[in-house]
Amino acid sequence: MSTEEDPSLVDAEESMEEGSVTQDATEETEEEEEQEQGDEAGPSERKRSSRKKGGKGGKKGSKKSAAAASKVEIPDPYNSTSEEVCAAIGLTDVEFDYDEEEFQGISNLKTFSSIIKPQILEANPGTNVSKMYPMFQVKYKEYQDHMAAQGKPVQKQARGSKTPAVSTPVIPPRSAPTKTRSARRKRRDSDAPDSDQEFEAFIKQQEQLEDDLVKDKEDARIKRAAEREEKKKGALEAARAAKKAKLEKGEEAENNDYCEECKQDGELLLCDTCPRAYHTVCIDENMEEPPEGDWSCAHCIEHGPEVVKEEPAKQNDEFCKICKETENLLLCDSCVCSFHAYCIDPPLTEVPKEETWSCPRCETVKPEHKIEKILCWRWKEIPYPEPLEAGKEASSDDAMLKPPRKMEPRREREFFVKWKYLSYWQCSWVSEMLLEVHFRMLILLYWRKNDSDAPPEFEESVTSRHHSDNDPYKLRERFYQYGIKPEWMQIHRIINHQSYAKSQQDYLVKWKELSYDQATWERDDSNIANYEEAIIKYWQHRESKLNEDIPKNVQKMIAKHREAKGLPPKEDEKKKKKREKIDIRKKYEVQPDYVTETGGKLHPYQLEGLNWLRHCWSNGTDAILADEMGLGKTVQSLTFLYSLMKEGHCKGPFLIAAPLSTIINWEREAEQWCPDFYVVTYVGLRDARVVLREHEFSFVEGAVRSGPKASKMKTTENMKFHVLLTSYETINMDKTILSSIEWGALVVDEAHRLKNNQSLFFKNLNEYTIHYRVLLTGTPLQNNLEELFHLLNFLSKERFNQLEAFTAEFNEISKEDQIEKLHNLLGPHMLRRLKADVLTGMPSKSELIVRVELSAMQKKWYKNILTRNFDALNVKNGGTQMSLMNVLMELKKCCNHPYLFVKAELEAPKEKNGMYEGTALIKNSGKFVLLQKMLRKLKDGGHRVLIFSQMTRMLDIMEDLCEYEGYRYERIDGSIMGQMRQDAIDRYNAPGAQQFIFLLSTRAGGLGINLATADTVIIYDSDWNPHNDIQAFSRAHRLGQKHKVMIYRFVTKKSVEEKITSVAKKKMLLNHLVVRAGLGGKEGKTMSKTELDDVLRWGTEELFSEDLDAAEGEGSEKKGAAAQEIVWDDAAVDALLDRSNKEETPAGEDGEEKAEWQNEYLSSFKVASYQTKETEGQEEEEEEETEVIKEDEKEPDPDYWEKLLKHHYEQDREIELQKLGKGKRVRKQINYASENMGTDWSKQNQTQDDDDDNESYRGSDNGDGLNSDEDDYDEKKKRRRDEEKMPPLMAKVNGQVEILGFNPRQRKAFYGAVMRWGMPPQDSHQSQWLVRDLRNKSEKVFRAYASLFMRHLCEPGADGHDTFNDGVPREGLNRQHVLGRIGLLSLVRRKVQEFEQYNGQWSMPEIQDEVLAKAANGSAQGSSRSTPKPKEEPKEEPMEKEDATETVNGATSEPATDAESEQNAPVDEPMDTDEAKEPKEEPIETEKPRAARPSFKFNICDGGFTELHSLWANEEKVARNGKEYEIWYRRHDYWLLAGVVVHGYGRFQANFNDIINDPRFSVLNEPFKEVGAEATGSDIKAKFMQRRFKLIEQSLVIEEQLRRAAHANRHLQPDNVGPLAQRFADLENIAESQANIAKESSAGNRNANAVLHKTLVQLDEILSDMKADVSRLPSTFTQLATVTERLNMTERQILSRLTTKDEDAIANRSVLPPPGPFVTPILRQQMDGIQPKFAALYSKFMSENGERMEEDEPVEAEEEEGVKQEPDDETQDSAEAPPVLSAEVNSDDSNDVPSTSAAAAVSSETAADAEPASAEDQAPTDEPEPMET
C-alpha cells in the first residue's frame, strides 16, 4: 500500500513526527479536545474526526505550518526531558511534586494541564498559552513515569504506550494522528520513505491498546464489585452487633409490626439489620421454618443496612445563661443551657441528686390557653442568696448553691398578657422565659412596636390613686395602670347560661365597650364586680319573657339583695305591679309614672309630642316627627315605644335604624329613659354579629342558624329583645334575618336618608314586615318636593304612590291653594316645632356671613385653575356637567386653602416635625388670617368653638393651625367611628375640659351629636345643601345650651362660594313654603349645566381685571368694587364677635309676617360688617352694602370664557411648549445625589465658605452703616443662592461616607456642639457653634445638616436600627440622650436670657474696664486668648427681652437701662464711646472703700420641691453687709448658669475650669478666696460647682413641669410626633410614587385599577392612624379675660370709640404675641402685648392715668429692637424693694390697658402725620404689675 492509495498513513506519520506544536491557538485547543475524545474512542474514529476537520485548512494553512516548523525546531516531548523542551522554547522550568493530593486520579492530559498551567504561567508571565503545549506534554510523560514507578499506573493513557519492535524503521510511540493539515503538507513532500509493514505494525499497536483498555476496565469493575460486597458484609455485621448490644441493655428492638410485603400482621420474621419484618411465606413459599442465627432481609443483603447518622455529642454552654459567669454550673441534660443554682428563680436550696436534670427553660410548661395579646410589661427584681462567708472553707454543695460574692439583685421582665377566650379579669403576669420558649413570634412582634428598655406608661398609671373604699377589688393597681380600660372589666349583660347541676351555672358575659365576639364564659362563683346584679337581671328578664322559674340559688340571691336594700319580698312586689290597661287615646296631662320612676322629666312640648305619637298610633297613622334639631326627638320616640310596652298595647319587638355615629347616644338615652327595655345593639364586624344572633335574638335554642351568613329565623316565638338598635348599613347587609321578623314598630332616625326611593336602604326597608312607622328628621325637606313625596310614599304606599300625579297637582293650581293643600296633606302625618316656638328661655343664636379676601397665593391658584380648564369651561368645546363640577370643586379647594393641592403642599415650608410652618400657613389663606384673629379673641373671652368643614384634608391643615397657636382640640370625621367618637365628645363636654376647638366634618359631625358646651360655630366652607349646615350648627344650639350661640359662615368674596350661598337661599325658601305657612315659591331643582356655569363665572372678571389694573399703575382712576379690599382689623373683628342683641325688626305692618319666617330661615345670610382698604388715590367714601336677592335672568354669553381665558390659556401653553421638544429646554434644577456621589463638596464651595469666615455678621459701631451692610449682605446672599449647589444627601468621598457634605469628623464635631450648647439657634452659623471643623461649611449647607440632624432626632423607631428612614447611618446616636441634653440646655439658656437684661453680662462690672484696658494694651493674639469675647446675641434678642417680664422675690422687673444695654453689647464697642466709660470711672478710682454691689435679680420657681430655696434663704442671711461676692448664694448660681451658656456643657460635666478662668464670671472665684489655699484648687472648685449645677438643673426641670401644669400659656411642642411624622412621610411617598396610577386607571387599564384600589386603601389606613395620633397630641393654651373686662368698658363704648376717628392716635401694635425669650409666668399673670391695643382708646387711658404717665420717661425707639423704657435712678433703685400687693396693683386697669407712659403720649402726639410703623418694628413697652412670691 502506498501513500497515494491511503493518505491517512502520511497524515499519521506527520502527526507523530511533528506533533501539534506549531499549530495556532485555536487548532491546539481543538486538538486537545479531540485528544480527550480519542482516549475513549478507537483510532479509526479519531482518524475520521481528524479528516472531517482537515479540509478547512487548504494549501494556505499548510504553508504556514511548514514555515513555522522550519523556523523553530522543538524536541520530541516523548523522547526528551522537560529541561530540554523548556530550553528549546525559551521557558523557565517548574518542578512539581506528583505525590500531592491534587495529582491523584488524573487520567488525561487536559486535566493535568489545567492543574500545572497556573504555576507555569506564574513562572513565565506573559507567555502565550499555545507555546506551552510541548511543556504540558513532556510534564505529563514525566508524571506517567513517576506514577508507574510508584506502582500506580495511569488507567487512561493518552500517549506513551510502546509497541514491539520490528525490522522496519521504528515508529515513535504515538497515538493516532489528529490533524489533517499535516497530511496535506506530507502529500506535497513525497520523498519520505514508507512501507506497508509500518502501517500493519501501527494497526496492531492500536488493537493492542484497545484490548488493554477493555481488560483494565473489566478488572476495575470486578475489583469494585468485590469491594462493595465486603463493605456490605461489614455493614451487616456491624448492624447485627449494634442490635445485640441494644438487646443486652434491655432496649426493645425497633422493628415494624407488619409484613413488609403484604402489610399484614401475624407471626413475623424480624430482620437483624433493619426495622423490616416478613412472613416466612412472603419470603419463600417453600420455607417451612425460619432460619437459625442472624438473618438479614433481601433488602439489606442487596443494598446494605440503612445508614444511621450519629448525632453529635451534646455540649453544654460553658457559662451561666443568667449571669454569664463560669464555674459551679448545673448542666441541663435536655438542652445546651447551663445555670448556677443561685441564678434560678427561685434559687435551689440543694444540689439536684437525680441522674438527669432539666433547666427551668426545659421544665417550662406550655399554658393551657393561648395568649391573645401582650398588654404591658414591667421589671421584676430577683435577689441573690447570701454569698459564701469570706475566709471560710466552703463545701462543694455550698459553692454550688451560694454566689462567691455579694451580688446585686438582677432585673427580669414580666409580661401582662390577655388569654384567648378569657376575660380581662383573668389577665396575669408571665415570665419572659415562658414567652421565649412557647410564644416566640408573639414577643418578637411585640418588640417591633414597643420599647424594650422603658416599660409603657398609661393614663391610669400616672393619675392619683383611688381611695381604697372606692376600689375594693384594687382594680387600678391590678389592671387599670397596665393598659386595661375600666369598661372592659364591667359587665354589660349576661347573654346566656349553662347549668351543670341544680345550683351550678356558667354564664356567658358580654363586657362593656367590647364586641360580642369577646364575650367569655364565667363561673357563677367568680369574684367579679356587680356579677350578682347581672345574674339577677338576666333571670328576671327570662322570667318576664318566658315565665320561667328562677333557680333557687338565684332566688336566695335576689332575696338577699332586696333585704339589704330594705325592699319587700318579691311576691308583694308582683301584686303591686299588676296595672290596669290604659286607653291609648288617653292624653297625658303629666308624664306617666313609669317615666317618672326613671328620674327624668319631660319638657311640656316633649309630653305633647308623646301624646301626638300615641294619637297617631290609635288612628293607625304613620308619623313624621320633624322637630328642629336639639329638641329631643330621641327621647320622645323612646318614651313612646316604652309606653306601648308598659301599657300592654304592643310587646314589640321594635326596630330602630339610626346613623352609626349616633348609636351610642341612643343606647345611653334608652338606658336612662327605658330601664325595663332589653335593647340589643346589632352592629359590628361579622364575628360579633354571629355571636349576637346566636345568643341575643331568641330564647329558643337553634332558632337562628349558626354560621357567618345571616339566614332566616326558624321561629320568631320568644324573641329575647324588646328593641333592636341597628345602623343603615346593617339593615342592608343582614336583610335576610331582619326581614324575617315581624316588627311591631319602626323608628328611622335622620329619615331624610329615605328621600330617594331608588336607594338600597329605601328598597330593603320596604320589604320588612312593619306594623307602624315613625320617621325622625330635623330637616323634612332638603331639596325639592320630590323628596318629600318619597318620605310620604314610605309611610303610606296606598295613599302616595304616583309621583307624576303628585307633582302635577301642585304645579297646576295657584300658589295660595298649593300651599294650603300641601299643609292639609302634611298635617296628619307631621309634627314640627321650632326652638323659637317651644324654648322661650333658650339662648338665641345669631348667624352671619363673613366675607374674606383671597390671598395672593389663592388668587394665583384660582386663575391657574380656570386657565388650565379652559377647554372644559368653553361652551363651544361642549364641556360636560361633570367636568364643570370638577372645576367647581377645585375652586372650592382653592378658596379654603391652597395647601389642599398636592403641588402647593409639597412646596409649602414645613417645620422639623413635618407640620406646616405657621406664618406661611396663615398668610396663604384669607380665611386663616381672619380665623386666627377670631380664635385669639374667642379664647380670651372664654368661648369654645366648633369648626365645620366638608373636606377632611382641610381638617388636617386646621390641626396644624391649632398646634401652631397652642390650642387643644378634638376631632370627628367619617373615619372616627363608634366609641372613639363618643369618647371625644365626652372629653369635650366634660366639666373643666381644656379643649378649646372641636374640628368636625359637616356630614359626619352633623348628626345626633350634642356639643352644647360650645357657644361659637364657624362654618368654614358652606355645603351645597344648607340643611347639612343647619344640622351642623344645631350641635351647639340645642337643649342644654346656656349661652348665646354665634354662627359664622365664611364666604370668599367674588368666588364660587358667594354663588353657592345664593343657591342655599333658594333651598331655605323652599323649606319654609312647604313645611310652614308663609309665602309661595317655585320648586327647587337640581342645578343645570347653565346654572353651574353661572356659578363658575362669578367674580372671575374682577379677578382677571386686577392684573390689568396693576399694569396700568397706581395712577389709574378706575374705581369700583374690585379696587377695594376687605380688611378685618381689630375693630371689625370685635364688632363681628359682639354677642349683644342688635337685630332690628323690619318696619312696616305688611312686613311683620314676612319677617317672622325670614328671620328664621334666612338670618344666616346676614352679612357681617367689615372695613375696606381703598387703593391709593381714591377718596374715602362709604359704599352701601347691597345684597342681591334676585337678578333679571340674562342669556349667558357663549364667548365669555373665550374672551376671558383664551389669551391666558395660549400664553400658558406657549410656556409649556418651551419646556418640551427639541433644542435647548427650560430645565428644572434638581439635586440628585446619585449624579455627584464622588464630588468633593468641601472644595466646591470653598470660596463661599471663606467669605463666611471673613465676613460674618458683626454689629456696627453706629447705625449709619447698617443699611450698607444689609445691602451688601442681601446681594451676597442672592449671589450665593444662585451659585451654590447643595451636596447630596449621601456620598462616598475618599472612602468616607459624607452626609450632606459632612465627613465623619465634621459630623462628630457637630454632635459635640449639640451636646455642648444644645439645639442650634438661628444664628448658629455666626456664633460659637461654628467650631474649627465646621468653619468651611456655608450657612446653607450648615442649616440643611442641622435640619436633617433634628429631623433624625424626632424620627420614630428603635435606636437599634442601623439607619434612619432615609438611609442615613445612625452611627450609634442615642436619641434620648441627645434630646435630654438639648432640653436641659434650653432651660438653662432660657433662664439666663430671662434675667440677662437686669444683671448684664459681667458678674463684677467694677473690673470690666480694667480687664478691657489690659486687653487693649496687649497684642491682638494675646488679648484674644486671655479675654474671651462675650457671646454675641442674635439681632432679634433685644426685642424679645422686653417681653420677658418676671417678678422675682417681690421685685418688679424693669426694662434694661442704657448702661445695661451697653453691657449687652460686644466688649469692643464701649472702648470707643465716652458714654460707656463714664459710669465705670467712679468705681475704679475709689477702690479703697468697698464698692457698692450692683443690683441683682434671679429666681427659680421650683415650688419647694428641691432644697434650693432653703439653701438660698440660709445663704442670704450671711451674704449681707458687703459680702455679696464672698458668700455663695443665688447670685453665684445665676453666673454659673451664664457660664454654662457661654462655655457649654462638657463631655461629662460642665466646663467649670473654663468658666472659672473667664473674667466675666470672676464672682465665682470670690467665695473660695477666704476659705484657704486648700479649697482654691481648680478640682475642688469644679466639684463644688458640679454639685451645685446638678441641684440647679433639678430645680429648672421641676420649674418647667410646674409651668406647664399650672400656667400652660405657651405653645409647647408635642411630646411624641415621631409616629405622626413617619406616617406623613409614608403618605407623601405613597402618593408620589403612585401618582401615575390614577392616570392609567382612568385610561382603562384594569391592572392599574387594582393597584389604585390597594393604594387608596393604604392611604386611608395611614390617614386614620394620623388622625388618631393627632387627636392625642398635647397642646396648651391660655385663658384671658374678655375684652370688655380688660378695657373696663362696655361693648357700646368700645364701638363708639373705635368708630371715632382719632387724629392723634399712634399706630396699632402687633396683635401677635412676642416671639421670645421665654417668660416664666406666675399666678394670675397676664401677658402684655398679646391683646391688641386700640389706637382710639389712648386718650381715655392717658387721662385716667396721668400721674403714672408723668413719672415715666420717654422711650427711645431703636432699630429692629422694639421700644425700651429707660427708668431713672429712683425707679431703678425702687425696683429692688418688694412692692406691696394691693387692689390697685392687681386691678385689670393696671395690667391690661395700653402703655400709659409719657413716652406713649409724646409719640402719639408726634406720630399724627407720620407714616405708621410696621407691626414688626414695634413691641410692647409696659410691664405687668408684680406679685409677691
UniProtKB/Swiss-Prot annotation:
Keywords (A to Z) from UniProt: ATP-binding, Helicase, Hydrolase, Metal-binding, Nucleotide-binding, Nucleus, Repeat, Zinc, Zinc-finger
Chain positions of all zinc fingers (PHD-type): 256-303, 317-365
Residue positions binding ATP: D627, E628, M629, G630, L631, G632, K633, T634
PROSITE patterns according to UniProt: CHROMO_2, DEAH_ATP_HELICASE, HELICASE_ATP_BIND_1, HELICASE_CTER, ZF_PHD_1, ZF_PHD_2
UniProt region (Disordered), positions on chain: 1-81, 147-198, 1168-1198, 1234-1289, 1415-1495, 1745-1829
GO molecular function: ATP binding; ATP hydrolysis activity; ATP-dependent chromatin remodeler activity; chromatin binding; DNA binding; helicase activity; histone binding; RNA polymerase II-specific DNA-binding transcription factor binding
Matching Pfam families: CHDCT2, CHDII_SANT-like, CHDNT, Chromo, DUF1087, Helicase_C, PHD, SNF2-rel_dom
Segments forming domain Helicase C-terminal: 930-1093
Compositional bias annotation for Basic residues: 48-63
Segments forming domain Chromo: 401-458, 489-550
Basic and acidic residues: bias regions: 1429-1444, 1474-1490
SMART domains named in the record: CHROMO, DEXDc, DUF1086, DUF1087, HELICc, PHD
Span of the annotated motif DEAH box: 749-752
Chain intervals with Low complexity compositional bias: 1792-1811
A cellular component term, taken from the record's GO annotations: RNA polymerase II transcription repressor complex
UniProt superkingdom: Eukaryota
GO terms for biological process, alphabetical: chromatin remodeling; embryonic digestive tract morphogenesis; negative regulation of transcription by RNA polymerase II; negative regulation of vulval development
Composition bias, Acidic residues: 1-17, 25-39, 1177-1186, 1749-1773, 1819-1829
Gene knockout outcome: Larval arrest, protruding vulva, sterile progeny.
Complex and partners: Component of the MEC (MEP-1-containing complex) complex that contains let-418, mep-1 and hda-1. Component of a NURD complex that contains let-418, hda-1, lin-40 and lin-53. Interacts with lin-1. Interacts with pie-1. Interacts with akir-1.
Protein name: Protein let-418
Species whose genome carries this gene: Caenorhabditis elegans
